[in-house]
Regions:
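Hydrophobic alpha-helical connector segments
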Residues: 71-101, 111
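The alpha-helix within a helix-turn-helix
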Residues: 35
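Hydrophobic/aromatic-rich alpha-helical bundle segments in the mid-to-C-terminal region
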Residues: 107, 129-202
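Hydrophobic/aromatic residues within well-ordered alpha-helical segments
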Residues: 9, 56-63, 84, 110, ...
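An amphipathic alpha-helix adjacent to DNA-recognition modules
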Residues: 7-18, 22, 27-31, 39, ...
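Short Lys/Arg-rich basic patches
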Residues: 1-3
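Conserved acidic
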Residues: 5, 9, 80-83, 87, ...
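Amphipathic alpha-helical segments used for helix-helix packing
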Residues: 92-119, 129-134
Length: 202
């Protein structure tokens, strides 16, 4: 059973780094500063994280997962396509609310690790809520469908991150969401994927 004190101290440290990164600037808080803000000791910090970067990564992944979780998933593959623009728009709006935070975690030393986590998370959601779920569960090469989902998730993540980091010159969220959603829907509906799946099932 998890010690509630450990759970609480981890939450306090995550809240401390999240608050620090929510403000403009590039300075990274020290372990001493974070411990003071969270009200925990340095040994407690090291019980959870090896360094500040690993704490930043954990906080970023937690916030990204919460953002994805706030978007209501569709109930069937048939409803997925018309819902994609709304879902993508909601994600972009959510990123903008904490633009300073995401800019800092997506341009610093944690950028790759955070993006890899987001790609894996998005790929899993595609395999769960999109028409890929039906193809993945049918007889055939599951690994191929999973790789395709990862490919789509990586491309989507790249476009979203690029849009966010454009700063004041970025296009309106609605316009960007429309384009990203169209590419995502086209990819999932790809006849090439259907052909690959059909061939692998033989």
């Amino acid at each position: 059973m998890t010690d509630p004190r450990l759970t609480r101290s981890r939450e306090l440290l995550t809240a401390a780094i999240t608050s620090a990164l929510d403000h403009p600037g590039d300075a990274q808080p020290s372990i001493t500063e974070l411990c003071a803000e969270a009200g925990v000791s340095r040994p407690t910090f090291y019980q959870h994280f090896g360094d500040v970067s690993s704490l930043i990564e954990a906080a970023a992944v937690e916030r990204m997962h919460a953002l994805f979780g706030s978007v209501t998933p569709v109930s069937s593959a048939e409803e997925w396509e018309p819902a994609v623009p709304r879902v993508v728009h909601g994600l972009l709006d959510g990123l903008l609310v904490h633009a300073d935070f995401y800019r800092r975690v997506l341009t610093g030393g944690t950028a790759r690790a955070v993006q890899e986590s987001v790609v894996a998370f998005l790929a899993q959601r595609l395999l769960t809520f999109s028409p890929l779920a039906e193809r993945e569960s049918a007889a055939g090469d599951h690994a191929r469908v999973e790789r395709f989902a990862t490919f789509l998730a990586a491309g989507t993540t790249w476009l979203v991150v690029g849009w966010l980091l454009e700063g004041d010159s970025r296009r309106p969220a609605a316009a960007a969401a429309t384009d990203i959603a169209e590419l995502l829907v086209t990819g999932v509906a790809s006849q090439r994927l259907a052909a690959l799946h059909s061939t692998s099932a033989k």
